[in-house]
UniProtKB/Swiss-Prot annotation:
HAMAP family: INFV_HEMA. Belongs to the influenza viruses hemagglutinin family. Binds to sialic acid-containing receptors on the cell surface, bringing about the attachment of the virus particle to the cell. This attachment induces virion internalization of about two third of the virus particles through clathrin-dependent endocytosis and about one third through a clathrin- and caveolin-independent pathway. Plays a major role in the determination of host range restriction and virulence. Class I viral fusion protein. Binds to sialic acid-containing receptors on the cell surface, bringing about the attachment of the virus particle to the cell. This attachment induces virion internalization either through clathrin-dependent endocytosis or through clathrin- and caveolin-independent pathway. Plays a major role in the determination of host range restriction and virulence. Class I viral fusion protein. Responsible for penetration of the virus into the cell cytoplasm by mediating the fusion of the membrane of the endocytosed virus particle with the endosomal membrane. The record marks 342-343 as: Cleavage. InterPro entries: Capsid_hemagglutn, Hemagglutn_HA1_a/b_dom_sf, Hemagglutn_influenz_A, Hemagglutn_influenz_A/B. The keyword Iron-sulfur does not apply. Palmitoylated. The gene is HA. Keywords: Clathrin- and caveolin-independent endocytosis of virus by host, Clathrin-mediated endocytosis of virus by host, Disulfide bond, Fusion of virus membrane with host endosomal membrane, Fusion of virus membrane with host membrane, Glycoprotein, Hemagglutinin, Host cell membrane, Host membrane, Host-virus interaction, Lipoprotein, Membrane, Palmitate, Signal, Transmembrane, Transmembrane helix, Viral attachment to host cell, Viral envelope protein, Viral penetration into host cytoplasm, Virion, Virus endocytosis by host, Virus entry into host cell. It is found in: Virion membrane; Host apical cell membrane. This is Hemagglutinin.
Length: 564
């Protein structure tokens, strides 16, 4: 009985040991993240990587202001539609905006050869200047042909500003030949057309010659054209058609034209220079007084986030497009609430069972209990290293996704609808690959982050254990019971790593011997009890066997024969 009393007394005294615990911060955040191995892991803090807001306006970029074509299409500007006179004197732009409505483009019905390539060429330049190429006053033809299909802003018959409709003069249309040399230091884009009358009578009426031949040649092209005469459906009041062509005349090159009818001859060309973003947007957004690094068809996006889910088509340095509406990067700790019913030191588990809501000055820290009371303090060094690491992780994700990739919205004609379909599929597949890479990267980083936080707490725990050495007992739950009296100054030295274990070595050794002695007494007591129990059990069993044997003999059920 004395042994049990001594054991109880010493164990009770052990609960009075000064104690220091290692743990981490927890808060009331409801944020969760996904990792490679877990879904919806609670964390104290996250960074949303997908930007969703947008300002519905048009802004300039570092290359300048956009060219907003309110009433004209790009084709109308290039051909010189008479209702696009506003753009005759040349323009400069960073990108082009067309409105999603019927625009003034090709006024006399017909089609432009390689139209999408012409649009792409013009959208990629920065500015143009109109240059005179041919002077038709020297030609023995009429060069003032007009059409009601190409009315000007006064609703009077007119024609393209970049070309001349050549017709007979004095009842004749002799063969006309002329040439132009590009003496400028930039390319010149020029256009021409071939007229296809609806009837032979109109052919003769306009050009005298029933069978004509026109040619346009340079060192790179050699084109000859004959009209296809015949009636066609009425479009813009016309049964005739025009096929439109274009070419690029490089510096030093010469273009030669020859015709005896049906040629819509080039008069002005466009001297093109510089490079723009090479994009054509189509929207009704208003123009703002602003400059942006990221312009989408839907508006302006100003953000430092690496991803957006608004549009895959953009201009400038925009976040990568991913279909996902949210992608969260963990930049805090695993958010495990403290066990509430155990009190501050009832069984603090630190990094094992839960965090501390009272740890507000850092991510990792200490709680202690001694004769002076209890206290909590953050470990600023490990916290700062972790915060710096989180910022590096965020920058790492941004850098890995910073390789600019633009999905260019190629424009193909109806004839090339299959190419358009293939292009769209390729765009979608590339976008899916980017989205998969982004999600996988974030899952990996989240996994590493949570693992690193666990390691940081363990490292802090190991640091304290190395400082205390044999002067404390590791209770296995993130806490240490100190085998000597440790006031607040002593606790500070443990936290900052200046603790001198030799100063308390003797006191701790004596206390540890007491603890070990109690354990020995306890073990001896248990051994004696075990022996007593075994002997008593054996005696009882032996008595039961003997009693059964005697009972059997008395009843005649057992017969004993002794042989000598």
């Amino acid at each position: 009985m004395e042994k049990f009393i001594i054991l109880s007394t010493v164990l009770a005294a052990s609960f009075a040991y000064d104690k220091i615990c290692i743990g981490y911060q927890t808060n009331n955040s409801t944020e969760t993240v996904n990792t490679l191995s877990e879904q919806n892991v609670p964390v104290t803090q996250v960074e949303e990587l997908v930007h969703r807001g947008i300002d519905p306006i048009l802004c300039g970029t570092e290359l300048g202001s956009p060219l907003v074509l309110d009433d004209c299409s790009l084709e109308g500007l290039i051909l010189g539609n008479p209702k696009c006179d506003l753009y005759l004197n040349g323009r400069e732009w960073s990108y082009i905006v067309e409105r999603p409505k019927e625009m003034e483009g090709v006024c006399y019905p017909g089609s432009i050869e390689n139209q999408e390539e012409l649009r792409s060429l013009f959208s990629s330049i920065k500015k143009y200047e109109r240059v005179k190429m041919f002077d038709f006053t020297k030609w023995n033809v009429t060069y003032t042909g007009t059409s009601k299909a190409c009315n000007n802003t006064s609703n009077q018959g007119s024609f393209y500003r970049s070309m001349r409709w050549l017709t007979l003069k004095s009842g004749q249309f002799p063969v006309q030949t002329d040439e132009y040399k590009n003496t400028r230091d930039s390319d010149i884009v020029f256009t021409w057309a071939i007229h296809h009358p609806p009837t032979s009578d109109e052919q003769v009426k306009l050009y005298k010659n029933p069978d004509t031949l026109s040619s346009v040649t340079t060192v790179e092209i050699n084109r000859s054209f004959k009209p296809n005469i015949g009636p066609r459906p009425l479009v813009r009041g016309q049964q005739g058609r025009m096929d439109y062509y274009w070419a690029v005349l490089k510096p030093g090159q010469t273009v030669k034209i020859q015709t005896n009818g049906n040629l819509i001859a080039p008069e002005y060309g466009h001297l093109i220079t510089g490079k723009s973003h090479g994009r054509i947007l189509k929207n009704n957004l208003p123009m703002g007084q602003c400059v942006t690094e990221c312009q989408l068809n839907e508006g302006v996006m100003n953000t430092s986030k690496p991803f957006q889910n608004t549009s895959k088509h953009y201009i400038g340095k925009c976040p990568k497009y991913i279909p996902s509406g949210s992608l969260k990067l963990a930049i805090g700790l695993r958010n495990v609430p403290q066990v509430q019913d155990r009190g501050l030191f009832g069984a603090i588990a630190g990094f094992i069972e839960g965090g501390w809501p009272g740890l507000v000055a850092g991510w990792y820290g200490f709680q202690h209990q001694n004769a002076e009371g209890t206290g909590i303090a953050a470990d600023r060094d490990s916290t700062q290293r972790a915060i710096d690491n989180m910022q590096n992780k965020l920058n790492n994700v941004i850098d890995k996704m910073n390789k600019q990739f633009e999905v260019v919205n190629h424009e193909f004609s109806e004839v090339e609808s299959r190419i358009n379909m293939i292009n769209s599929k390729i765009d979608d597949q590339i976008t899916d690959i980017w989205a998969y890479n982004a999600e996988l990267l974030v899952l990996l980083e989240n996994q590493k982050t949570l693992d690193e936080h666990d390691a940081n707490v363990r490292n802090l725990h190991d640091r304290v254990r190395r400082v205390l050495r044999e002067n404390a007992i590791d209770t296995g739950d993130g806490c240490f019971e100190i085998l000597h009296k440790c006031d607040n100054n002593c606790m500070d030295t443990i936290r900052n790593g200046t603790y001198n274990h030799k100063e308390y070595e003797e006191e701790s050794k004596i206390e540890r011997q007491k603890v070990n002695g109690v354990k020995l007494e306890e073990n001896s007591t248990y051994k004696i009890l075990s022996i007593y129990s075994s002997v008593a059990s054996s005696l009882v069993l032996l008595l039961m066997i003997i009693g059964g044997f005697i009972f059997g003999c008395q009843n005649g059920n057992v017969r004993c024969t002794f042989c000598i």
